[in-house]
Amino acid sequence: MATPVTAQCSSKTWELSLYELHRTPQAIMDGTEIAVSPRSLHSELMCPICLDMLKNTMTTKECLHRFCSDCIVTALRSGNKECPTCRKKLVSKRSLRPDPNFDALISKIYPSRDEYEAHQDRVLAKLSRLHNQQALSSSIEEGLKMQAMHRAQRVRKHQHESDNTTFSGGEDNCDSRSHVSNPSVHSNQEAGPSRKRSRASEDSGAEPDLSHEGGVRSPDPPGGGENGSEIELVFRAHPLLVEKDGYSQTRYVKTTANATVDHLSKYLALRIALEEEALRGGAEGVTVGEVSEKQYTIYICTGAAGGQYTTLNGSLTLELVNEKYWKISKPLELYYAPTKEQK
């Protein structure tokens, strides 16, 4: 059995047997042609500096490594007086010699050099464009995720601050709640008219306050301060009962959980009436007596495919609606349409 012999090369170590060391290649006696892919020769025709095909090939006299003329001259001018491949000493350009035979070989393999370079430029431009689009889409997705995360943090912070404000400034509500166990009736009598006055001012058509998310906050129902929990709503026009050119605006509302469907219906009627008056230029005033909770009917989507809508009873609270129909941690989506008698 032949024992392996180690042949040392400048860059690689080959394990060759005695047969491989001493054998002679078989000569081709007929006209057989061996096809070799140009890609397999790319490493032999590539400049180690620019990693592109050799142009105006220059060979080092000491170590016989090949480089592009511009690449090796630039490397020597930069101060590294050595071969970029093997680090042999190169004093100056006198250590280099042109290699026209290798240039002729490349021109034989690639007769249309300009066409090859143009094709390569097109491939690189296409890759760059695709990568830029992918980077842009991924950047947009990351930006949307960060915005959603920061928005959720702002919502929690705003709710926490509003709860603290309610607890610190809600002495009137505390007095009104303590009338059952506290014999002091004087504080309850003082808190009662103030609540009635605030309710009357809200029913008189005052502009609702803007919430932190750009929506509107509906008027609190009587006794709204007794329940600290709040529910966020998304009001949309009924897709089947409302014309597209009608009330197509999506409304975002935040109110207490013990508000009823009738409260929302009356608030919606008042809000739409005020908007219509503003569009008409304020020619006709809107009074509280003209607004009724019977003008609009509130629906909720209960079908899995989104095509089935259930009418909500006016006495139901939003908390019961959320527990019975919604049961997911996202704003409650409700739909409204004019009542058939009112329409």
From Swiss-Prot:
Region described as Disordered: 147-229
Pfam hit, one: RAWUL
Region (Interaction with HIP2): 2-180
Catalytic activity: S-ubiquitinyl-[E2 ubiquitin-conjugating enzyme]-L-cysteine + [acceptor protein]-L-lysine = [E2 ubiquitin-conjugating enzyme]-L-cysteine + N(6)-ubiquitinyl-[acceptor protein]-L-lysine
GO BP term (any one): protein ubiquitination
Main location: nucleus
Assembly, per entry: Component of chromatin-associated Polycomb (PcG) complexes. Component of a PRC1-like complex. Component of some MLL1/MLL complex.
Protein's recorded name: E3 ubiquitin-protein ligase RING2-B
Organism encoding this protein: Xenopus laevis
Name of the gene this protein is made from: rnf2-b
